[in-house]
From Swiss-Prot:
The lineage of its organism: Eukaryota, Fungi, Dikarya, Ascomycota, Saccharomycotina. The gene is PAC1. This is Nuclear distribution protein PAC1. GO terms for molecular function: dynein complex binding; histone binding. Keywords: Cell cycle, Cell division, Coiled coil, Cytoplasm, Cytoskeleton, Microtubule, Mitosis, Repeat, Transport, WD repeat. Its main location: cytoplasm. Residues 73-106 form a coiled coil. The keyword S-adenosyl-L-methionine does not apply. It is found in: Cytoplasm, Cytoskeleton; Cytoplasm, Cytoskeleton, Spindle pole. The keyword Cell cycle applies. Self-associates. Interacts with NDL1 and dynein. WD repeats lie at residues 126-165, 169-211, 216-257, 260-299, 322-362, 382-419, 423-457.
């Protein structure tokens, strides 16, 4: 007995008959051949068996032979949607079980740092142009967005209908931004641009106020980092002119300019007096910026390096969040880190152990002749195109790529534990996640499609 009601069963039979009729040749202009007579006989027999009037199929709607394939395609789409919903239900079930076992998430129980984003976005924001860099406010529920049109915007994640602040920061595209909150609770936002300039803005009273323009690079400024060094707030920048420069925001002076690579310096990260850089020459390098001296370097990438990040050492009391790349090591305390992670256009992420330089009392660090090279300890493969950005949080690394996916890697096993697809319709240029300060369960990504996508619990 059929599970379909009579009307749906009749419609299905008509669709079947129409589909078969659309696949056989039509009637001849003059008479019928033997083959056509046999086909007509088969069609009449099938119509009789299905209890469909073959003469009632001549209407425009009835004669549509594509109706059955369309219905089949809709079933496939429904099945795909069912699979997505089942996956979402499983994620919610896992979260519920975790709450039952461990209680609410808090910094004390470490649940926040082990958070993995869901595969469905919470919401998205249209930036109006390709998003080139994003940065979460270190303390407030705000996100700073930079676009290839040179605009810098700030959105409140609790009310994202309109930007809190927006300014045309540069005449050409912004390549990178960074944010820092000092002891006086002032938020400073640094930008780098294709117009050869770096700028520093103060975010206060829902305004982005320009306080400093840093000029000196002779080509595109690729990346920027802002941090506090002792009592001064400094900015480090790198450029296609092959140089890295360190600036004092208080007066706008360039404190140091040095050339760590032989080709375009694409990216950098800073900790204290040490800077790590990645370049079009496919190498990564450790330098002591106050002297400009190169201390060691690593080779292994096959194409230009897109991003490099320092993996800071964990304090002894945070052993629960430790893995082999950030375990507390007394020998590395003067450096502040033992490993870095880099991404490349070769589709891989690579984790490097940085060799310790020679530390001599009352002298600048010296290269160690016995260990001049980085030690490649892990290669993470999973992306199928350029890997644009990476962030490290707890025991996980988060990467985004031109293959339109965000992947979450377990640093204990170097395996993908979650792959998030279909967030953007174009390349994913940048991501950010809380790596320190407030442990919010929040990830943002920016794409070439002009969208900022937010994933939160």
């Amino acid at each position: 007995m059929s599970l379909l009601p009579p009307e749906q069963r009749q419609l299905l039979h008509r669709c079947i008959l129409n589909y078969i009729r659309s696949q056989v040749p039509g009637d001849g202009a003059e008479g019928e051949t033997g083959g056509q007579t046999e086909e007509r006989h088969v069609m009449n027999s099938l119509a009789k068996w299905l209890r469909v009037d073959p003469d009632g199929l001549d209407g425009e709607k009835a004669a549509d032979g594509s109706l059955l394939p369309r219905k089949w395609s809709s079933i496939v789409r429904l099945q795909r949607r069912i699979i997505e919903l089942e996956k979402e239900i499983q994620e919610l079930t896992d979260e519920n079980e975790n709450l039952r076992e461990n209680g609410p998430s808090s910094p004390a129980n470490g649940a926040l740092k082990s958070w993995l984003p869901r595969e469905r976005p919470s919401f998205s924001i249209s930036a109006g142009a390709s998003v080139t860099s994003v940065k979460l406010h270190p303390e407030l529920p705000l996100v700073f967005i930079a676009t290839d049109a040179g605009k810098l915007q700030c959105y409140d994640l609790m009310n994202y209908t309109m930007p809190v602040a927006s300014v045309q920061a540069h005449m050409r595209g912004i390549t990178a931004i960074d944010a820092y909150v000092g002891e006086d609770s002032q938020c400073l936002v640094a930008t780098a641009s294709k117009d050869l300039h770096c700028k520093v803005f103060r975010f206060v009273d829902s305004e982005l106020q320009l306080i400093r323009t840093l000029s000196g690079h002779e080509h595109i400024v690729s990346h920027i980092k802002i941090w506090n060094n002792s009592t001064n707030t400094l900015v480090a920048s790198c450029s296609r002119d092959l140089t890295c420069k360190v600036w004092d925001i208080a007066n706008g002076w360039c404190l140091k300019s040095f050339q760590p690579h032989t080709e375009w310096v694409r990216c950098l990260d800073v900790m204290g007096d040490f800077v790590v850089t990645g370049s079009n020459d496919c190498t990564v390098r450790l330098s002591h910026w106050p002297t400009g001296r190169s201390l060691s370097f690593g080779t292994g990438h096959e194409f230009p390096v897109e991003k490099i990040r320092i993996i800071p050492l964990q304090p002894p009391e945070s052993a629960e969040h430790s893995h082999r790349f950030n375990t507390h090591d007394e020998d590395y305390l003067p450096l502040g880190f033992s490993h870095v992670i880099s991404t490349s256009r070769d589709g891989t992420l690579r984790i490097w152990q940085v060799p310790l330089p020679r530390f001599v009392a009352h002298r600048a660090p010296q290269p160690n002749p016995a260990r001049p090279y980085f030690n490649l300890v892990a290669t993470l493969k999973g992306h199928s195109s350029w890997v644009r950005d990476v962030r490290v949080r707890g025991k996980h690394a988060f990467s985004c790529s031109d293959d339109r996916s965000i992947k979450v890697w377990d640093l204990s096993t170097c395996e993908v534990v979650r792959s998030i697809n279909n967030l953007h319709s174009g390349f994913i240029n940048c991501i950010d996640i809380d790596c320190g300060g407030l442990n919010r369960q929040l990830l943002v990504s920016g794409g070439a499609d002009g969208k900022l996508v937010i994933l939160m619990k």
